[in-house]
């Protein structure tokens, strides 16, 4: 029997719950926190569901597996890193050395959530090189792999410009890009938010060493004079709607 028009209109105007897109974002945020703090292998997929406030089986509506979720986290993080790199380097296009320093300092301007994300990227990078038989996992893996290459290419192109301008010595730009990124990424093997060192102290040390790898003289006095930067404690906007994993490892 057709329902009264008023009832149909009322139902159309009823408030809706969180969209699939926002729920997916919440899962990614919570998984980043949990995987980053506890370690990917030691984290339980069911704990992600509990923190988001959904049943374990509901996770499979968004991700085929815990590994599929990990690849998606990696792909999004790498894309964000590349966009941030291109934005900062573009803001200092007239002075390569200034741009290089700004890019390196910007790389350490991170929230605690982003630090955990970087820790996860570094610790599980090897999984990006392992072929998957599941099509969804393989597609996500290939995307993360391609975005790794895109970030390295952006760095190599940027460094080539510096060499062409005579700002840094000639070298293989791909190897130099990997050397700088490798030194930067090494921080996240050991750095922990709220540990013995502030992120600003780590940044002051590593920025100068990355500049030295590029062939520029270290400016220790300038590093000491710059104000210390600490990991920001702000919460990513999309994570505010859900709980975050707790505990440390």
Give, region by region, the residue ranges found by the protein language model.
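C-terminal peripheral helix-coil segments that are non-catalytic and often amphipathic
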Residues: 1-11, 106-113, 149-164, 181-183, ...
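Helix-turn-helix
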Residues: 2, 26, 30, 34-68, ...
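Amphipathic, non-transmembrane alpha-helical scaffold segments
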Residues: 20, 28, 70, 74, ...
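Generic hydrophobic, amphipathic alpha-helix propensity
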Residues: 23-31, 48-49, 73-85, 155
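Short coil/turn segments at alpha/beta junctions that flank glycine-rich nucleotide-binding fingerprints
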Residues: 37-41, 114, 165-166
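Hydrophobic alpha-helical connector segments
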Residues: 72, 86-117, 177-180, 220-229
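Amphipathic alpha-helical packing segments from all-alpha helical-bundle domains
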Residues: 86, 131-165, 174-178, 201-204
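Amphipathic alpha-helical segments used for helix-helix packing
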Residues: 112-139
